[in-house]
A protein has these predicted regions:
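Short beta-strand and strand-turn-strand segments in soluble, beta-rich domains
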Residues: 26-27, 59, 71-81
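Hydrophobic h-region of N-terminal signal peptides that target proteins for export
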Residues: 9-19
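Positively charged n-region of N-terminal signal peptides that target proteins for export
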Residues: 1-4
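Terminal connector regions
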Residues: 99-120
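Transition segment at domain starts
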Residues: 17-43
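Short, well-ordered beta-strand segments enriched in hydrophobic/aromatic residues
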Residues: 44-50
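Intrinsically disordered, low-complexity Pro/Gly/Ser/Thr-rich segments with frequent PxxP/GP/PP motifs
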Residues: 75-104
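Short, acidic/polar linear motifs in exposed loop/turn regions
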Residues: 52-56, 70
Length: 120
């Protein structure tokens, strides 16, 4: 019986971690792309601010897509700007997920959005 209870708790635990907030309760402001260096040493900075407009503290996962001039996705990466820390209502955190990307000369456009929300 104890095993059944423990098993049920482990299965249901991830469900309890999702916040009552939705991805639309978060906004990304001042998103900027900057490349520094040259040749093989080019480093990307893909930075911005993640703002919590939800009524409760929560964290959000951000997805960035790097696209060529035709709109084809070359690379896509996801990250949690605040890590495992919840962002208080009305507060923001700065992020830079550029280190997750390997620079390609045909990267022309970038899209960014919130894809998941949870409480830690």
């Amino acid at each position: 019986m104890k095993r059944l209870i423990v098993s049920a708790a482990l299965i249901l635990a991830p469900l309890a971690a999702h916040a009552a907030c939705a991805p639309t309760d978060f906004a990304i402001q001042d998103f900027k792309m900057k490349a520094t260096g040259s040749g093989q040493g080019v480093r990307l900075s893909l930075s911005g601010q993640l703002v919590n407009h939800c009524a409760e503290a929560a964290a959000a996962q951000v997805k960035i897509e790097a696209k060529d001039s035709g709109g084809k996705v070359l690379q896509a990466k996801q990250g949690w700007p605040a890590g495992t820390t919840n962002i208080a209502p009305g507060q923001s955190v700065e992020f830079d997920l550029g280190r997750l990307f390997r620079y390609q000369t045909d990267m022309q456009n970038y899209t960014v959005g919130v894809v998941d929300v949870r409480t830690w």
